[in-house]
From Swiss-Prot:
This is Ribosomal RNA small subunit methyltransferase H. The gene is rsmH. It comes from the Bacteria. It comes from Nitrobacter winogradskyi (strain ATCC 25391 / DSM 10237 / CIP 104748 / NCIMB 11846 / Nb-255). The lineage of its organism: Bacteria, Pseudomonadati, Pseudomonadota, Alphaproteobacteria, Hyphomicrobiales. S-adenosyl-L-methionine binds at G36, G37, Y38, D54, F81, D102, Q109. SUPFAM superfamilies: Putative methyltransferase TM0872, insert domain (SSF81799), S-adenosyl-L-methionine-dependent methyltransferases (SSF53335).
Length: 332
């Protein structure tokens, strides 16, 4: 008799679903379906419906069992989570009761050498979540030294970004940098780490992954889309894993949760009513038991907010001036 498959337990899963507070008959969006942990927990509440979104076709295929088990209450859509408003509209769910997001790379992606996300497993230098668009190997081969340095500094917060970029450009003159191990070896020669510190290539790999998948642009767009689709009283829960993501979520909710501001030096400015009420004044973090069971959970942060009845705030904010995948790949 074969043992049943181990069910994926998402980081801060219990806390995130508690923040959503699923109710019978509610419609929820699992914007980063992954292995389906959040969806399964939401579906445990009677008569709930879940729209699961993931840009990774492997995740969508892997969720077929849960779709069948749910009796039609789970619908899976292969798409970017920045498109969640359009996905919801296509499923006759223009307004929903909750949205949960688990931002960044999944354990499944990290643990599969062929996906090229991890410096710990040798494989092709790919890093694409969807399988579409330029690979990390193509970025490393074509980006200028200046662009590489900016990418590694901005998205990886690597202080030695210029030295890493210089080493990459020097190495690629002798042949393609096609594997994760090849890149990790190049970075390790210029970034030194003590035994108790993170691997020297950690920040460079993070930077390339974020850049290849346009993760921060996607997150900004997804937060705004969630604001548009949530009903009054609907809830948003976001789990992030590094400071760049968490800062975006924190700033978005802080801006959307303010009623105005001013001081004796500066009169209060007129602004729209807040579209969110913050539920987590400080982010929730994993307990010791969860970190011990899953060391990758150590950096996780959960922030949540409840949608007010105010209109979504269209502030026309532009994306920050960081390197663009399209511009870098065409040499612009």
């Amino acid at each position: 008799m074969t043992a049943p498959p181990i069910r994926h337990v998402p980081v801060l899963g219990r806390e995130a679903v508690a923040m959503l507070a699923p109710r019978a008959g509610g419609v929820y969006v699992d914007a980063t379906f992954g292995a389906g942990g959040y969806s399964r927990a939401i579906l445990a509440t009677a008569e709930t419906r879940v729209i699961g979104i993931d840009r990774d076709p492997t995740a969508i295929a892997g969720g077929s069992g849960l779709v069948e088990e749910s009796g039609g209450r789970l619908i899976l859509v292969e798409d970017r989570f920045s498109h969640l408003a359009a996905v919801c509209a296509a499923q006759d769910a223009a307004a929903v009761d909750g949205v949960v997001m688990d931002v960044g790379v999944s354990s499944m992606q990290l643990d599969e050498a062929g996906r090229g996300f991890s410096f710990r497993l040798d494989g092709p230098l790919d890093m694409r979540m969807s399988g579409h668009g330029p690979t990390a190997a193509e970025v490393v081969a074509r980006a200028s030294e200046t662009d590489l340095a900016d990418i590694i500094y901005i998205f990886g917060e690597e202080r030695r970004s210029r030295a890493v970029a210089r080493a990459i450009v020097g190495a690629r003159r002798h042949g393609p940098i096609a594997t994760t191990r090849a890149l990790a070896d190049i970075v390790s020669k210029v970034v030194r780490a003590k035994p108790h510190e993170i691997h020297p290539a950690t920040r460079t790999f993070q930077a390339l992954r974020i850049f290849v998948n346009e993760e921060l642009d996607e997150l900004i767009a997804a937060l705004a889309a969630a604001e548009r689709v949530l009903k009054p009283g609907g809830r948003l829960a976001v789990v992030s894993f590094h400071s760049l993501e968490d800062r975006i979520v924190k700033n978005f909710l802080a801006w959307r949760g303010k009623t105005g501001g001013g001081s004796r030096h500066r009169p209060e400015i007129e602004r729209a009513p807040p579209s969110f009420a913050i539920l987590t004044k400080r982010p929730l973090t994993p307990g010791d038991d969860e970190v011990q069971a899953n060391p990758r959970a150590r950096s996780a942060r959960l922030r949540a907010a409840e949608r007010t009845d105010a209109a979504a705030i269209d502030d026309g904010a532009e994306l920050p001036a960081w390197p663009s995948l399209a511009n870098v790949m065409r040499g612009g």
